[in-house]
Amino acid sequence: MASLLKENDDTVRWGIIGAGAVCEVKSGPAFYKCDKSKLIAICRRSEQEGKDFCARHNVPKYYSNVDDILNDNEINAIYISTPPSTHHEIAMKCLAKNLPTYVEKPLGRNYTETLDIVNKFKQKKLPLFVAYYRRSQSKFLHAKKLIE
């Protein structure tokens, strides 16, 4: 990832695609609260809800179109928080723009989509992450322990 950042700038400048309920209460605030992480823009179909999100979270830019946020040169990483049926298409657009991508679970709708995303990001040596945050929650750790 370091090679994808601008020289003398180790800040990840995020664009969020799909700033809805999942983003609002789970992952979203971390993108601007963590050190060396800055939330530059969000993309949401509803202009009113998108601009409201920006105002409440002090996000400088709003887009209603995926292609527009991906063309923002200030952004150097993308978080996809849209319905799973859109993950593959949006991930491929991020890949085409050489943007490291963090995708809300599940990565794809099925094995074929998931494998396609993983393999194409690997081929380009581009960082790809999936938001499997629940695996660190106590009830899931307990279930894992029981299974093992």
Spans of features found by a protein language model:
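N-terminal Rossmann-like dinucleotide-binding module
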Residues: 1-57
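Alpha-helical structural signal in soluble globular domains
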Residues: 30-34, 53-57, 92-97, 116-120, ...
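Hydrophobic residues in well-ordered beta-strands that form the structural core
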Residues: 23, 63, 103, 128-130
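A contiguous active-site-proximal alpha/beta segment in oxidoreductase catalytic domains
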Residues: 108-148
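A general structural signal for well-ordered alpha-helical segments in protein cores
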Residues: 28, 50, 87, 91, ...
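Beta-loop-alpha module in the N-terminal Rossmann-like domain of NAD(P)-dependent dehydrogenases
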Residues: 60-120
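Short, well-ordered coil/turn segments that N-cap beta-strands
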Residues: 37, 76, 99, 126-127
